[in-house]
Structure formats: structure tokens, C-alpha cells
């Protein structure tokens, strides 16, 4: 699969397990579609090198937790390849604000002043959207173009080749995509989507973050530190300071 002038590289541990799917005819059609949209001057998000950022940040054997999203944010500068996450300096989206509220209520962790979730990904939280690209101002513009088959394959591969993962399935879309998960092998937590439209129906109060850590610790694994560095500390680390 190619994007723009160069080939998008999948992180090696993932390439070894799901890379062959990128050679499927539907993925070649998706690649042609992306080139066509860019040639028509469509603003495709996230930028090409960030499309597979979730896999780069969380190699296959390091995955402990999987969060399934739907498709990337479609505003300028928002999407960078991790579901629910935005780059530092971008306003925190409403769904992520509700995620932070639940973490604060569940674990007593103060709400961060940014929406950059890379520290979670580096600890083993795979932040995976079902569809990996979108167009500016057009939510869902790249649905049913081929991404869903690839990310279904990712979920199926994790289900088959790993054990004891935690899957956080928020909303009916994620829960439908997670139907293949063997709950005898993995721990699945379900709740309504954290969107302001549905968070009050059971996402708020779900305690998924403490439950996730309890499961990991029972398996002898280190828990996820759901706190995030301050924006100032983040800027310093990103600047190499």
C-alpha cells in the first residue's frame, strides 16, 4: 500500500503478522482511492506518515489494552493516528473530556491540560480506529473503502495470537467490531460511547480504568499509568529537553 510518493511503513512486529493484508485487492483499491482524493486536493487526515501511528507506538507484543474507535477527527490539525487523541495545543475534544472525567472520578487523577495520549500508547494501550483516514470537515468520508477489513484483521489477530488482553469497547460500533473477541481468552469491558450524547447513559461511572489495572495486576503485569504529563512537561520532552 502506498500513499503520496512514498510507501507507508508498518511497524515490523505488526508487519510480520498483518502486513500481508495490505497486499489484498481491497487495500490496493483503498490506496488508489487515497491517491485520487489527494489529487483532487482533498485534505486527508492524518498526514500519511501518521496513518499507522497506533502501530508504531504500540508494537504487537507490547499490547496490553485495546481501545477501539471509529474514524479520525476531521478538524484541521486534530488527527495524528491514535483514536481519541489530539496533538498538543489542539483543544481537547468533548469525548476525550468525558474520558478524563471518568478517569478523575474512578482513580482521582486530575484532568490533563491537553489531549495527547501518546504516553498511554507507549505503555501498551493500542488506540485503534476502525477507519484510519478521513477528509477535512467530512466525518466518515472514508468508511467502507477498505480500512474496516484491515482493522478487523488486526483485532482477529490479537484475539488469536495474544492472551489476557483488555478490550475497551465504548459504543455500539466498537462493540459490534469486537464481537469476534474470545472472552474466555481476553477481558472485555463495554459501555456507551463517551460522546456527550451518550456518556451519561453508563460511560460515566463505568470504572473501566481501575478495572483494567486490576485485571493486568492479577496477570502479574504492570498497571497503566492513566495520568498524563502537563502540557509544559510534554512540550519540553517533545523538544528534547
UniProtKB/Swiss-Prot annotation:
Places the protein is found: Cytoplasm
Keyword set, alphabetical order: Cytoplasm, DNA damage, DNA repair, Hydrolase
GO BP of this protein: base-excision repair, AP site formation via deaminated base removal
PROSITE patterns: U_DNA_GLYCOSYLASE
InterPro entries per the UniProt record, alphabetical: UDG_fam1 (IPR002043), Ura-DNA_Glyclase_AS (IPR018085), Uracil-DNA_glycosylase-like (IPR005122), Uracil-DNA_glycosylase-like_sf (IPR036895)
The keyword Translocase is assigned to this record: no
Coiled-coil annotated residue ranges, if any: none
Active site (record annotation): 71 (proton acceptor)
Enzyme Commission number(s): 3.2.2.27
Reaction catalysed by this enzyme: Hydrolyzes single-stranded DNA or mismatched double-stranded DNA and polynucleotides, releasing free uracil
Name of the top EC class for this enzyme: hydrolase
GO cellular component: cytoplasm
Chief place of localization: cytoplasm
Record-linked Pfam families: UDG (PF03167)
Domain of life: Bacteria
An example molecular function term from Gene Ontology annotations: uracil DNA N-glycosylase activity
Keyword Ribonucleoprotein: no
NCBIfam families, alphabetized: PRK05254.1-1, PRK05254.1-2, PRK05254.1-4, PRK05254.1-5, ung
Family indicated by similarity: Belongs to the uracil-DNA glycosylase (UDG) superfamily. UNG family.
Function: Excises uracil residues from the DNA which can arise as a result of misincorporation of dUMP residues by DNA polymerase or due to deamination of cytosine.
Protein known as: Uracil-DNA glycosylase
Species: Xanthomonas campestris pv. campestris (strain ATCC 33913 / DSM 3586 / NCPPB 528 / LMG 568 / P 25)
Phylogenetic classification of the source organism: Bacteria, Pseudomonadati, Pseudomonadota, Gammaproteobacteria, Lysobacterales
Gene that produces this protein: ung
Amino acid at each position: 500500500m502506498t500513499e503520496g510518493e512514498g510507501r507507508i511503513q508498518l511497524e515490523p512486529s505488526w508487519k510480520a503478522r498483518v502486513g500481508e493484508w495490505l497486499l489484498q485487492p481491497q487495500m490496493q483499491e483503498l490506496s488508489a482511492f487515497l491517491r485520487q482524493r489527494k489529487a483532487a486536493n482533498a485534505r486527508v487526515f492524518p498526514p500519511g506518515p501518521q496513518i499507522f501511528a497506533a502501530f508504531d507506538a504500540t508494537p504487537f507484543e507490547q499490547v496490553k489494552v485495546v481501545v477501539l474507535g471509529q474514524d479520525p477527527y476531521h478538524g484541521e490539525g486534530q488527527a495524528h493516528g491514535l483514536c481519541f487523541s489530539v496533538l498538543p495545543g489542539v483543544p481537547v475534544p468533548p469525548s476525550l473530556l468525558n474520558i478524563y472525567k471518568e478517569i478523575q472520578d474512578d482513580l482521582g487523577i486530575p484532568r490533563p491540560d491537553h489531549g495527547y495520549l501518546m504516553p498511554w500508547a507507549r505503555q501498551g494501550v493500542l488506540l485503534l480506529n476502525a477507519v484510519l483516514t478521513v477528509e477535512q470537515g467530512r466525518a466518515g468520508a472514508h468508511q467502507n473503502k477498505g480500512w474496516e477489513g484491515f482493522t478487523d484483521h488486526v483485532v482477529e489477530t490479537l484475539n488469536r495470537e495474544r492472551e489476557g488482553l483488555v478490550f475497551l469497547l465504548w459504543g455500539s460500533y466498537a462493540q459490534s467490531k469486537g464481537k469476534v473477541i474470545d472472552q474466555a481468552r481476553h477481558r472485555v469491558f463495554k459501555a456507551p460511547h463517551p460522546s456527550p450524547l451518550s456518556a451519561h447513559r453508563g460511560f460515566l461511572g463505568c470504572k473501566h480504568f481501575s478495572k483494567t489495572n486490576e485485571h493486568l495486576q492479577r496477570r502479574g503485569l504492570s498497571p497503566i499509568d492513566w495520568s498524563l504529563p502537563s502540557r509544559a512537561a510534554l512540550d519540553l520532552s517533545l523538544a528534547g529537553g
